[in-house]
């Protein structure tokens, strides 16, 4: 990673960019801490929480969730992924189902009880963020969405 050079552009723009970087880092730290509190309160490993988030995101987008895709998303090998899925299954948060189109493939489904549990903890924050977005007009919301999408792309491809 290279540091921005003083002569690489307008210093005010660099300062604004760095303020945003620091804010994003602060939000990330707080969200991580919140996830850790959720994990501790519900006898989960932080990786289990990340796995549930990945599986919920897959369900939201309609993408099939398999142990292989989950392992890739979490950066785990097959043994590590199996351990995570086994723990979540034992706790009743996830179930394995055979794919009806390809019986060789196993799909991972999040149980409704896990969704309810997540909403009970994270729901107030989600509602606050959605309400906060009401302060911005549609053009500003589109800019925020584009910015966060670009940041996500930079993080995942960087």
Residue ranges and their predicted role:
Residues 79:
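Key DNA-contact positions within bacterial/archaeal DNA-binding proteins
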Residues 35-76:
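N-terminal helix-turn-helix DNA-binding core of bacterial DNA-binding proteins
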Residues 86-142:
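Charged, amphipathic alpha-helical coiled-coil/dimerization segments
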Residues 1-10, 139-158:
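C-terminal regulatory/oligomerization modules of transcriptional regulators
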Residues 1-42:
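N-terminal leader segment of winged-helix/HTH proteins
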